[in-house]
């Protein structure tokens, strides 16, 4: 919701997709850098302790961003405020998946030892991916409806409202929260980022984040060029629907392939399924291309 809402308000005020795209890119990079840090803080201090410090700052910064854009202050102030806002972004999906692992395997941090455990966790993660896609289906529709029917800033404001309501509810679910794991004085394990496999995944997912961000701005520009800007949210919802369908399928399959092989397969599939979007010359054909492109997303991020 953030990136789409940002595009609507910035384009409405500045009439520049270049500025909107630059802001969206800066926001995505900042988020990518910030979320691992806050995930680590959540592991060390507990999720609730981290969230009660982070979320108020994020909300305040987004309110400031909205005010600065509407007041048409110098563009650099928009960048500063959005950097601050996204610097306090948290990986909500990661936090929830960590809770699933805690509930299903409370006495261990991994499920590699047990095949049945791996299938149960994969099913839980697939369910969570499905719920993510439900949000990604409804979110763009809500943001687009608010931004095009009420005011350009209404999309950002609706996102802020969801954060203000949702995170207190998430924090209150204490029974699912994993206990904090204080940092050892002498950690026998090397830093995860030093693992070459992790480095490869980080590089791929960083570029993947850029792909996701570009889809939002390109979709808005595509629909506006054809005089149907209000349909951009529906197109993004169709994209998420394709991912939701694949999340359901992925959840019922007992995969024999290792995770690394599946990651490469679905990364390749996403690349191939992105090609038809280059040849879509109507909203209908773009909707079809987005739907099938979404098929590769959920299995990839799971």
Predicted feature locations:
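Hydrophobic core of transmembrane alpha-helices in multi-pass small-molecule transporters
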Residues: 61, 74-92, 206-207, 286-299
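Transmembrane alpha-helix termini and helix-breaking/packing motifs in multi-pass membrane transporters
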Residues: 66, 138-159
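C-terminal transmembrane helical hairpin of 12-TM major facilitator-type secondary transporters
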Residues: 260-301
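Cytoplasmic membrane-interface "Motif A"-like loop-to-helix N-cap segments
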Residues: 44-57, 255-268
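C-terminal ends and interior cores of transmembrane alpha-helices
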Residues: 56-73, 171, 269-281
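Cytoplasmic helix-loop-helix junction between adjacent transmembrane helices
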Residues: 81-134
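Helix-loop boundary and gating motifs at the non-cytosolic
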Residues: 1-32, 188-239
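Helix-to-loop junctions at the C-terminal end of transmembrane segments
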Residues: 33-47, 147, 245-259
